[in-house]
Amino acid sequence: MTRDELKTTKIGVLMGGLSAEREVSLASGGAVLKALQSRGYDAVPVDVGRDLPQVLVREWIDVAFICLHGRYGEDGTVQGLLELMGIPYTGSGVLASALAMNKIVAKEVFAARGLTIAPYRVVRRGETVDPVAEGFGYPVVVKPSQEGSSVGVSIVKSPEELPSALELAFRYDDDILVERFIKGREIQIGILDDRAMGAIEIVPVNEFYDFEAKYTAGKAEHICPPVLPAELHRRLLAEGEAAHRALGCSGYSRVDFLVTEGGECYLLEVNTLPGMTALSLLPEIALKESGIGFEDLVERILISAELKIKGEGAGS
């Protein structure tokens, strides 16, 4: 949609939601809402609950700017509802959102496309796992299949720590991942209009870039752009775009990597609805690597809003 067309519409900023990342979503949505209103758009907040269809109709929402994180927002469910209601929306479509949210399926897609991922084992509720027997050894990373912002994630350094880590992860999902721990630098790639904008390195104060480090000032250092050999920097940008394409993402995303001392790049995940808070990484990459300020970034994402399902009957 064009800027002029969007100025005549009512934009609902979808935020909050039902996931464990509700508070982060409210922060992202609040920042986006302020940016849109400052640019003269008729934008209103929509706190997403199970009455979302009724709210969208009652508020006469024409376009949805999705600022949801986690389940029931980042996983294709809301995207499917918007497709059914014929409301154009920002970000990736139903399938790409669902694939990216499910770390197990996403890893299978990445591996099929030749992208490097850490060795892993899927553990389902009621099963046990021995990292030594799997060839991983310790430490390992234990994480739920379908949560974001490091919710339910643990770094396990010994057999004694494994049961509590599994118990924590199973609070959030019936399927979890046990991955070989890769020691390396955390590099994240920002994607806008399906092209890599640049990279950022995260150096957490503590050992692990956890939920607190992601959303608390002073808990992590951001280095943008990261200090990398030129060839490695180019490779990360290219692999970031490749991961975005592999899942069929559209518009924007953030792609997370671990880079070892030897220059190996391990793809961790693709975030189809990255945070848009004051401490979020995508806005920082946009500004420092591409000279795109926050309001411009929000507007460019808005302009990309569309229905992804094409064909007869779509959006009618």
UniProtKB/Swiss-Prot annotation:
Which cellular compartments is it found in? Cytoplasm
Pathway per its UniProt entry is: Cell wall biogenesis; peptidoglycan biosynthesis
The prosthetic group or cofactor this protein requires is:
Mg(2+); Mn(2+)
Gene Ontology BP terms: cell wall organization; peptidoglycan biosynthetic process; regulation of cell shape
Q: Where does ATP bind?
A: 133-188
> Keyword Lipid metabolism, does the record have it?
no
Task: Indicate which residues the UniProt annotation says bind Mg(2+) 2.
Answer: 269, 271
What this protein is called in its record is: D-alanine--D-alanine ligase
Q: Which organism is it from?
A: Geobacter sulfurreducens (strain ATCC 51573 / DSM 12127 / PCA)
Lineage of the organism: Bacteria, Pseudomonadati, Thermodesulfobacteriota, Desulfuromonadia, Geobacterales
